[in-house]
């Protein structure tokens, strides 16, 4: 088995380089005989989302960072769990590495694990239905308002072509709105064939699954085209492939060829759309979008579209998840220390 494991602390996962450096430092210190790592793991038996851009997780992550390198604690990690990974091992765990003191590692892992159990249902922001969320965004007196569509997040395995929010924006005649990404390689190809500035009848989105909603049929203006585009995510670049922006009424829609979620502002700026100057910015993402959009958003609203990634994990059709586990089982108890 492994002697040292270091996990991301941040969600969005913008700390990949920092955690790699932490891991390397611990490995080198161990090889030099400077420390003797011992690990403890506490199993909370819960499925939950823990965005570290918001409280209470922001404060907790700052606390565990401050613990490292003091009083014999070498590393502290919280394995959030991937809620849509239907595997027996699903669930939140706390991992503590201490310098030769198993009891100290056990005690801290237990304390942090019990703290997370006490925060069941209290770490993720609320989500609204589509009409309510959009109405709240339109009523807000500043811009931009970022509307998150986590149910159709490609990062969680969704197709990223659900049209519920887009269709609602079109129906209510929304202005100064942009939305993306919608994964539709065929529509992108048609836009390139037609050319920048063309007006064409286009059917797009709503193709892949029953949860995708209905395709949008509209007369669109092609307002942006870019080959082999990318968007940022922390220090990395995420390829989106060929992409096109089409305008339907007052809504600009980003269509992409490579299925991925919204992470960087470049998703829009690649195509001449400045999301900082739009009233409503709809992003298909759960929380990774916050790395770039959080600092510019005047307000962030989560809505629940008809996409397949249910925020209420009791509605996820798990087959392999080991039971009992909260919230599938309301009375699930933490397993406690597993090593």
Regions found by a protein language model. Give the residues of each.
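Short gly/pro/ser/thr-enriched loop/turn and capping motifs at secondary-structure boundaries
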Residues: 11-18, 185-187, 289-290
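Hard-cation-handling environments
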Residues: 48-250, 254-255
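Short, acidic/turn-prone active-site loops that include or flank metal/cofactor-
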Residues: 9-12, 204-206, 306-308
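Flexible inter-domain linker/hinge segments
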Residues: 32-74, 89, 299-301, 305-339
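Internal gly/pro-rich beta-alpha loop/helix module
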Residues: 1-35, 42-55
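Structural alpha-beta junctions
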Residues: 2-4, 70-71, 168-178, 276, ...
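Conserved acidic residues
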Residues: 3, 145, 279
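Extended hydrophobic packing segments that form well-structured cores
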Residues: 117, 230-339
